[in-house]
Amino acid sequence: MLDSDSIDLILKDLKTHDFVFIALHGSFGEDGVIQSILSKNNIPFNGSNEESSRNCFNKSVTKDIVMNQGILSPKYYHTSSNICNDHIDFNSEKYIVKPNSQGSSVGFNVVDNFENLNDAIDIALDFDTSVLIEEFIDGREITVPILEDEPMPVIEIEPKSGIYDYKSKYTAGESRYICPAVLNDDKYLFVQDCALSIHKMLKCDVYSRVDFKFYENNFYFLEINTLPGMTETSLFPMAAKKHGFS
């Protein structure tokens, strides 16, 4: 954990540089904290500002903003307790349980029946103070990178397990990626436009990656990543390469 002395030492070093490229994931990196520190010290950095980063890292806040604009998203319940079964007002064949503010699918679980929700909630609460319980939407995993207010090639993700969890994201060979995704022209352009609209309504800057499920001819917004991964196997560079960037 960083204390104030550690932050002061880091800032002293950062101030000797012209620009800071943030390549952090999870808390401190994606939740607006480092963005706030850099902004207050007039240090330029990549990506979205403090407010946008904070809102986008908080999944329930993100969903509320997006759903209030009429965009489809899985029904959900936000809680800080595992005693919540009586309060969930939607039925689902399965349930997605995940920390409300985390990344990389840490603490993520798919629950096959209502009775097993509590165990999954306990796991998610190990990683955050609150949990999102979502309706399970079966369908194709679709993601749209955005760069400078322009949608990049759409990518479809095919996890071998059928669920795009931590293992599917970070273990070689566990997922197949199709870029560009095979969609008819109307749907392809629609999901690009939808992703760009979400990027703008959440006041993201420079770049982001917007995730969807495609089911029964509809796209359901899942979440947005304001600091997409930039490794050789990450999705954003894959789309950028297809778009013509070296």
Features from the language model and the residues they span:
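A short, polar/charged loop-to-alpha-helix boundary motif
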Residues: 162-168, 231-239
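ATP-binding N-terminal substructure of ATP-dependent carboxylate-amine bond-forming enzymes
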Residues: 1-51, 55-57, 61, 80-87
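Conserved metal-phosphate-binding beta-hairpin within the catalytic cores
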Residues: 135, 199-232, 240
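A glycine- and small-aliphatic-rich helix-loop capping segment at beta-alpha/alpha-beta transitions
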Residues: 36-45, 113-118, 243
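Active-site nucleotide/adenylate-binding loops and adjacent lid/helix of ATP-dependent enzymes
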Residues: 10, 14-15, 55-140
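Short, intrinsically disordered, charge-balanced linker/junction segments flanking boundaries
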Residues: 1, 74, 243-246
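Phosphate-binding site of ATP-dependent enzymes
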Residues: 112-193, 214-220
